[in-house]
């Protein structure tokens, strides 16, 4: 059994903590970084061993986090608070990289939306996060994962994997391949908009899951958006769309029975009410017009990535059985095609909310 005090006591003492460290123990559900709760005789902190294999640019990542959190704090918004090292750095690099945040007390996280109001509130939380950062110069941010939502680039990678067909799997997924190829003309709208300025460059979170919102344990209201490692420059369409992709589906991402997989327009409406209500003052007309498209784009992009990985021998996404990535791809294609069929209705919902 690991003695966390022995293992991490020394590194925790390199940070400007209040009080004497009494206890260090594992904390939370995160998979990327090792997260520990540090208790002193004065207060509590979160110590993280940063995963430099997933995110090698620790300087860029911490500059992004510090820039965004300082901007939010200057506006009186509750957010993650980076605790500096004793010599004033945002993180420490020994054999591994470590950082510390103040622990935000009296909060809880939810793994799943127990009801439609929780999903609406998550839309409000991520919308407020976007709105508060509308004036932040996103061009100052480091692109932590290069070309993360550059869908045409993802499509090029898909075509390359298809051409190679290194594992002879293309014959098993002709229908899915045909869907991805036939929608090529829909993939470039967001990137073209960012390039020509018709879509503003914004701060994007890029991991808008429900469990990345700290909720007040008494009122249930959102207190702070957390897990800021994937903060990058991008489009509002990316965060909104990805939330809808996984949040407005009636089934799990790897549901084999496609008769259970549907895009739920009522869940879309609930999230949009929360999100659009919060960004009313900063959203542009073009962004509002493209929110339904953003939902489709993030869904088809994700499906395309699953299909690319399947064709390439399952080297990126963790799989539990052969064909797992193909099953995931099929759910995303099903959702994307249902969204496509309901663009008009989705657009009317957005217009009504923003009217």
What are the residue ranges of the model-derived segments?
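Catalytic activation segment of kinase domains across protein kinase-like and atypical kinase folds
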Residues: 211-250
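Hydrophobic alpha-helical bundle architecture
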Residues: 102, 274-295
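Juxta-kinase regulatory segment immediately upstream of eukaryotic protein kinase catalytic domains
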Residues: 1-25
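Active-site beta-strand-loop-beta-strand hairpin of nuclease catalytic cores
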Residues: 39-44, 220-221
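Active-site activation/catalytic loop segments of kinase-like enzymes and analogous catalytic loops
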Residues: 237-280, 297-316
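ATP-dependent phospho-/nucleotidyl transfer catalytic cores
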Residues: 25-29, 52-59, 107-122, 135-205, ...
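ATP-binding glycine-rich phosphate-binding loop
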Residues: 20-40
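ATP-binding pocket architecture of kinase catalytic cores
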Residues: 43-140
